[in-house]
Amino acid sequence: MNRRSFLARSTGAVTLPFLVNGLPVHAFDGPLLADLFNLAEESDRVLVLVQLNGGNDGVNTVLPIDQEAAYKAARSNIAIPMSAALKLNDALGLHPAMADLHRTFGEQKVAVLNGVGYPNPNQSHFRSTDIWMSGSSSNQVVSSGWVGRYLDGVYPGYPDGYPTAAMPDPIAIQMSAVVSLALTGVQQQSMGMALQDPETFYDLVQGTTSGGGGLPSQAEARSNVAFIRDVQGKAQVYSAVIKEAAAKADNIADYGDTRVNRLAAQLQIVARMVAGGLKTRVYVVSLGGFDTHAAQTLEGEPTNGSHAVLLGYVSAAMAAFQRDLEAHGVQDRVLTMTFSEFGRRVASNLSLGTDHGTSAPMFIMGSKVIDGIRTPYPSLTDLDRGDLKMSIDFRQVYASVLEQWFGADPAVIRQILFQDFETVPIIKAGSTTHVDDATSAGGLTLYAISPNPVRGTATIRYRVDAALPVRVDVYDALGFHVATLAEGHHSHGEHSAPFNTSTLPSGTYHVRCSQGRQHVTAAMVVVR
């Protein structure tokens, strides 16, 4: 079943007397319908979150070459020889198991953020995970996630009324049995769907199992949070588009033995869905085992052990994922970011392990990343009761991603993260997101809408190469006309029209530029 057929069946569009958001679906009929269905399949930026469950030991992940004496004194029984470190610069190096990611770093596609944490850190796995996923302070208990709140603003009312012509695909996908707090919206509704494991994906693609029932309504979400979070097996409405995307692309990069490296198995699937044109905005994958209280290294072999194996998995999986994206030509659309609920203490314990700590490094990978060491490494001697002090708040990283990758307005970011946070440059200049690249038809070109998403006034830029009347219109997600921005003869060359969105509700709108029989359409997201 192709995407158009799937949407027609699932919403009753055009031919069946169904309603969408209380409006008759014949509003979708006519030439605009074709435009909405034929919007660029690869129009949105993608964020891939890699969760390292258990609390990753950052001190043995990014090695402090320039603090070697303090490092050896604090953890002599698990200290990795600095001669084995994979140098990032003269001061820092990666664990020797991370050769693949080190090569990607050398290709200027990896940013390293050291000392990422938050004030008054909590060393409980469950509580600290909630803090990272909710984007809250340690003294706040929040029942929604930072990504969920962002997506909730971009796709208001989800899941009611979805899929739509503008967003026919899952908004977010988590490779897990349930959707995590990070993807939970303000009404405690899941903003995505869960694929329990890689086997579930391949069963779905091969048709050996169904996607389950439809998504529950928002009313059900409010009355039964667990039900809406546990959407695995209930997202049949999206199974067809996932199968269609998977059929469009095969993995090109070598991911190694994915039966052993489960992170590689998950990222392999994400690459296939992105390359296949799925418009999903956020993916969440994970790897467990980082709670290394004991046997983190082998006795007398500090470069080997459970932590080395895990870091090797992360390194190989992320590097293969980046190569796969590049082989498919979609690398500019994807940003990959690691996180863990906390780091480990500076001092090792007597069991060849480390105990719960505070700050730890994050890796951000992508072709648009400002590569290199982005934040300073904490001191191994100036400690907070034996723990590393933080160099940067994790919410500064979130704010930077929201602003520089997704193009979110600072006022929107303040609402998402509950306060203002200073950002750190992580995305190359000129790479700020827009929903659609320039599209052309005949002598007509519609450029990227800026900013996008937009809170106030957007600028619509277009180029005219033929001496015919031009019309620029805005429609809402149901196909109803909202505004005409320009109409009449235009001189040859580029033109622009401002569009004040301050009176519009949040949601996805469509700008349609027409000239004779030629027309081009781009999506624009309004946030409040």
Regions found by a protein language model. Name each.
Residues R45-V46, I171, V334, A360, ...:
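Residue-level detector of short, conserved catalytic/binding motifs and their immediate flanks
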Residues G54, A294, R344, R455, ...:
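Short, glycine/acidic-enriched loop or turn micro-motifs at the edges of active sites
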Residues A429-A441:
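Low-complexity, Pro/Thr/Ser/Gly/Ala-rich linker/spacer regions in secreted
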Residues V284, D332-F339:
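Beta-strand segments within the central parallel beta-sheet cores of soluble alpha/beta enzyme folds
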Residues S440-S450, V454-R528:
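C-terminal outer-membrane/trafficking sorting elements
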Residues S340-D371:
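Histidine-centered active-site microenvironments of extracellular/periplasmic hydrolases
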Residues I65-E68, T354-H356, V435, S491:
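Glycine-rich, phosphate-binding/catalytic loops in enzymes
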Residues M1-S315, A320-H328, A347, I364-S367, ...:
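Feature for exported/extracytoplasmic and membrane-associated proteins, marking the mature portion
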